[in-house]
Amino acid sequence: MALTKADLSEHLFNVVGLNKREAKDLVELFFKEISLSLERGEPVKLSGFGNFNLRDKGERPGRNPKTGEEIPITARRVVTFRAGHKLKSRVEKNVKPKEEGES
């Protein structure tokens, strides 16, 4: 199950004691600030969690899989995320070994 903004708001309501409107507004503001920083071309560094960075990808040739026609893929800027050491180690501790036959 995915963690949603509504889940985060509910957690702030239950744990921190904010009312539901304040909790929802805080979550929205948090993501808005991250988005605005990235729009300005600034990296976002969340200590203990990870970094959001921007990467420019140049134009490159592509191909329509149905027709085989060559189509240029335009240059664009993409957001990348790199998990921090603390997050990586916490995730690694909670990995369950795969059972034989699982993919």
UniProtKB/Swiss-Prot annotation:
One Gene Ontology cellular component annotation held by this UniProt entry: cytosol
Keyword Plastid: no
Pfam families from the UniProt entry: Bac_DNA_binding (PF00216)
Keywords assigned by UniProt, alphabetized: DNA recombination, DNA-binding, Transcription, Transcription regulation, Translation regulation
Annotated SMART domains: BHL
A biological-process GO annotation: DNA recombination
GO molecular function: DNA binding; structural constituent of chromatin
Domain of life of the native organism: Bacteria
Basic and acidic residues composition-biased segments: 54-69
InterPro entries per UniProt: Hist_DNA-bd (IPR000119), Histone-like_DNA-bd_CS (IPR020816), IHF-like_DNA-bd_dom_sf (IPR010992), IHF_alpha (IPR005684)
Chain positions covered by the region annotation Disordered: 50-72
Function: This protein is one of the two subunits of integration host factor, a specific DNA-binding protein that functions in genetic recombination as well as in transcriptional and translational control.
Recorded family membership: Belongs to the bacterial histone-like protein family.
PANTHER family named among the record's database cross-references: DNA-BINDING PROTEIN HU, INTEGRATION HOST FACTOR SUBUNIT ALPHA
Subunit structure: Heterodimer of an alpha and a beta chain.
Protein name: Integration host factor subunit alpha
Species the sequence originates in: Coxiella burnetii (strain RSA 493 / Nine Mile phase I)
Gene name for this UniProt entry: ihfA
